[in-house]
C-alpha cells in the first residue's frame, strides 16, 4: 500500500498515535503541524507543541511540515466568535475550527498537494463513508464538534483512534515509544489552549455594566455585559441580595436590548414542546419530517428526544434542554450522526 495520508499532528497523544497506526498499516504518512493565530497577551504554546510533533515524526521516520494557517484561523474562528458574542450569542469555536481550518483550509491544502491523498486527525469519531458514527469510546466521542463535515469531505477523512478506547491509545503511545505518551490532553479553545474566553473577548468587546434580575424582575446584582454570559452559567456575575442558604444562581435568560440577565436557583427548564430553529444546517442523511431522533445542544450534554418539524427546525420532547443561540444542535439516529445546525 502506498496511499498518502496527511495527518494533522498537534503534538498531542491522539494525533501522534493516529500517525503511528497509519504508518504501521503501510500508509505513506506525512505529519503536518498547523500553526494558527495566538493572541499576544497569552503564553506562546505552539512552539512547544510543534516540537513534540516533530519528535514524534522523527521517531516514526515520516516527513514533517509546518503549515501556516494563522489568517484562516483568525478570520474563520476568532473573528467569527467575537462577532457572535457581540450579537449576544454563544458560538462554539471548536465547531468552527473543524469547519474552517482542519477540514476547510487544511483539507483544501492537502488536495492541492495530491488529489488522491487522505486527511487524518486524532478525533474520537468514526464514519461509514457518508455519515459520522459515534466513536467506540463514547465518553470521548467528538462527533458533536464534527457535524459540519459534508458527504464530499468524509470519504477522504480518517479517524484512526475512533475505534479505540482512550486508555488503549495511551498504551499504544508507549508501545510506539512516543514521547507524548503521558502528555495531558489539551483543554480550552481549539488550538489556542487554556486561555479564558472572557479574557480574550474583553480585548475586543467593551464591558457594559448591567443589572442581574431574579425571576420576579427584582434587581439582585450586577454583571459586566450580557454578551459575556451564556444560558446555564453560574459564575462571573455579582449577587448583592443573597438568600439565606446562599444557593447558586443560574442564568436563565438574557435581554440584550436592555443589558439585563435573569437568574434563577433552578437551572431546570420546561423545554418540552419547544421548537428549535436552526441555521447553517448540514445533513449527511436527509432528516424525515415527523421522525423522532436524539440530539444534544452542547458538548457532553445528555441526549434528548426531538422530532423533526422541518429540515431546519426540531421539536424538543423532554424538559431540561437549554437552547443557547449560537451553539450547535447535533442530531443522531442511533449511533449515526446525521448532521446538525446552529441554534438561532
Enumerate the predicted regions with their spans.
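AMP-forming adenylation/ATP pyrophosphatase catalytic core
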Residues: 120-126, 132-344
Amino acid at each position: 500500500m502506498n496511499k498518502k495520508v496527511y495527518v494533522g499532528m498537534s503534538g498531542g497523544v491522539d494525533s501522534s498515535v493516529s500517525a503511528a497506526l497509519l504508518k504501521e498499516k503501510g500508509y505513506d504518512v506525512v505529519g503536518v503541524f498547523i500553526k494558527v493565530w495566538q493572541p499576544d497577551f497569552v503564553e506562546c504554546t505552539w512552539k512547544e507543541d510543534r516540537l513534540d510533533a516533530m519528535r514524534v515524526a522523527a521517531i516514526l521516520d515520516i516527513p514533517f511540515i509546518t503549515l501556516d494557517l494563522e489568517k484562516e484561523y483568525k478570520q474563520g474562528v476568532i473573528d467569527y466568535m467575537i462577532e457572535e458574542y457581540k450579537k449576544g450569542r454563544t458560538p462554539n469555536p471548536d465547531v468552527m475550527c473543524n469547519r474552517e481550518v482542519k477540514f476547510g483550509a487544511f483539507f483544501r491544502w492537502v488536495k492541492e498537494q495530491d488529489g488522491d491523498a487522505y486527511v487524518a486527525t486524532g478525533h474520537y469519531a468514526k464514519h461509514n463513508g457518508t455519515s459520522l458514527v459515534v466513536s467506540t469510546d463514547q465518553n470521548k466521542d467528538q462527533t458533536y464538534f464534527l457535524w459540519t463535515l459534508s458527504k464530499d469531505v468524509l470519504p477522504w477523512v480518517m479517524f484512526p483512534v475512533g475505534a479505540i478506547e482512550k486508555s488503549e491509545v495511551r498504551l499504544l503511545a508507549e508501545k510506539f515509544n512516543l514521547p507524548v505518551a503521558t502528555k495531558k490532553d489539551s483543554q480550552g479553545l481549539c488550538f489556542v489552549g487554556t486561555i479564558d474566553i472572557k479574557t480574550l473577548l474583553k480585548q475586543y468587546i467593551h464591558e457594559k455594566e448591567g443589572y442581574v434580575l431574579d425571576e420576579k424582575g427584582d434587581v439582585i446584582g450586577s454583571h459586566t455585559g450580557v454578551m459575556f454570559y451564556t444560558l446555564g452559567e453560574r459564575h462571573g456575575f455579582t449577587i448583592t441580595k443573597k438568600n439565606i442558604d446562599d444557593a447558586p444562581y443560574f442564568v436563565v435568560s438574557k435581554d440584550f436590548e436592555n443589558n439585563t440577565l435573569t437568574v434563577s436557583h433552578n437551572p431546570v427548564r420546561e423545554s418540552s414542546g419547544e421548537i428549535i430553529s436552526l441555521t447553517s444546517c448540514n445533513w449527511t442523511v436527509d432528516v424525515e419530517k415527523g421522525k423522532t431522533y436524539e440530539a444534544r445542544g452542547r458538548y457532553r450534554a445528555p441526549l434528548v428526544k426531538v422530532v423533526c418539524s422541518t429540515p431546519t427546525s426540531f421539536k424538543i420532547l423532554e424538559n431540561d434542554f437549554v437552547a443557547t443561540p449560537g451553539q450547535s444542535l447535533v442530531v443522531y439516529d442511533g449511533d449515526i450522526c446525521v448532521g446538525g445546525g446552529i441554534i438561532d
